[in-house]
């Protein structure tokens, strides 16, 4: 297997390979934009043939298959992606990780019908999210063997080997309408916080490498230099946020836009809607649970000796409108089998927990869940009686609460 050795960067030559422009001291230039649509008209370049390449992405779906308040569901997400593909046949569809874990629906179905969903959209690959490890490494490796093409440049074995179930990068070759071809490399990156945000047993035998080092190995000093590809895109499950001056949230990833050879960054993890540029590199993220899809458009000019590619605009598109009948039928079957379409009728009032508004606050849902923990503890026959007379406090991580409980319906 290919060995990935970590060395200290000590020479000026390597530093020049590391960064673009004036090097590590280049000021961070951030262009912040609100959600917008790109209606750029591609001008005809005399003597050359132009075309448009679109990168369509979604992230942090978290198994949100069923349509609910604020969650469009798998059917609408799929149809929104297909609509974009109809507008431009030169479209590559990508996931940025955290695909299946996160909903009760997903847990009891073990991620189904995600394979059919990915197949319908022709998802080329996925970054590895921290929640990909929730159900253990065997599930992840089996999933990769069946239907998921994972990319993970900064996850290696603790022996320094690359992974058997994921590649550091994957190259997609598209035959364009102009008669040419374009080759795009997608380098996968995962938040290094995964090392302490998931069960140690689930990542046993793995190591998480500094993302800037891993991306550099797979970009300037490898892919572009060897002339293998026309573009390099970072597909990173690392948080971004429009409120952050540097856009990228994690300290060890802030220099990624300054790596020589990086043409775009498609991000996930922080559940934000992001469309911006750092160091003239476009950065995008498409919310959570399929609420949005991201789209980056590039002009491809066919010239003698290769392609000239430039970014022409982006869009964060809200998922809405018609739903895909095939995917809806699969979801409905699962809902019927497990009784998930039935409504609770005991709650007289809605218990509100909106993660976009009061995620960090005391909420009725949080109180209800932690009270249930206390009651379960007190009613457990295995708990010694002397412990039950002591004060008992229920504690729940705020990230585990993801939805409200609707008001019940009166019957009879």
Predicted regions and their residues:
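Alpha-helical structural elements
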Residues: 13-14, 128
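Non-catalytic terminal accessory segments
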Residues: 8-10, 16, 23-58, 62, ...
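Acidic, metal/ion-coordinating pockets
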Residues: 25-321, 364-372
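N-terminal leader/targeting segments
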Residues: 14-17, 159
């Amino acid at each position: 297997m290919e060995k990935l050795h970590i060395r200290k960067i000590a020479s000026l030559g390597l530093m020049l390979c590391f960064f673009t422009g004036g090097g590590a001291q280049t000021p961070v230039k951030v262009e912040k934009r609100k959600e917008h649509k790109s209606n750029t008209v591609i001008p005809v370049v005399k003597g050359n043939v132009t075309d448009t390449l679109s990168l369509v992405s979604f992230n942090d779906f978290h198994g949100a298959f069923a349509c609910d308040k604020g969650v469009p569901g798998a059917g609408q997400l799929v149809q929104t992606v297909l609509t974009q593909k109809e507008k431009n046949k030169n479209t590559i569809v990508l996931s940025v990780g955290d695909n299946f874990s996160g909903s009760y629906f997903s847990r009891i179905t073990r991620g189904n019908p995600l394979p059919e969903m990915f197949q319908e959209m022709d998802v080329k690959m996925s970054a590895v999210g921290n929640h990909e490890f929730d159900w253990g490494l065997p599930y992840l490796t089996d999933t990769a063997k069946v239907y998921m093409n994972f990319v993970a440049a900064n996850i290696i074995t603790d022996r320094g080997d690359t992974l058997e179930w994921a590649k550091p990068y994957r190259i997609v070759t598209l035959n364009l309408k102009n008669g040419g071809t374009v080759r795009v490399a997608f380098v996968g990156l995962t938040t290094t916080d995964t090392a302490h945000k998931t069960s140690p047993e689930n990542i046993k035998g793995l190591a998480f490498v500094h993302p800037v080092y891993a991306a550099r190995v797979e970009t300037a000093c490898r892919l572009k230099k060897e002339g293998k590809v026309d573009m390099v895109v970072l597909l990173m499950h690392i948080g971004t946020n429009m409120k952050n001056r540097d856009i990228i949230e994690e300290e060890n990833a802030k220099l990624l836009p300054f790596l020589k050879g990086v043409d775009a960054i498609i991000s996930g993890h922080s559940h934000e809607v992001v469309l911006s540029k750092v160091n003239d590199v476009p950065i995008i993220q498409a919310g959570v649970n399929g609420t949005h899809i991201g789209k980056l458009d590039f002009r491809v000019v066919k010239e003698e000796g290769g392609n000239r590619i430039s970014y022409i605009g982006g869009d964060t598109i809200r998922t809405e409108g018609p739903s895909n009948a095939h995917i809806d039928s699969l979801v409905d079957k699962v809902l019927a089998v497990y009784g998930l379409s039935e409504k609770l009728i005991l709650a007289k009032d809605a218990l509100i927990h909106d993660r976009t508004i009061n995620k960090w606050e005391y909420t009725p849902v949080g109180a209800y869940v932690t009270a249930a923990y206390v009651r379960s503890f007190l009613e457990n026959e295995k708990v010694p009686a002397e412990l039950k007379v002591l004060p008992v406090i229920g504690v729940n991580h705020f990230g585990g609460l993801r939805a409200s409980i609707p008001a019940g319906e009166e019957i009879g």
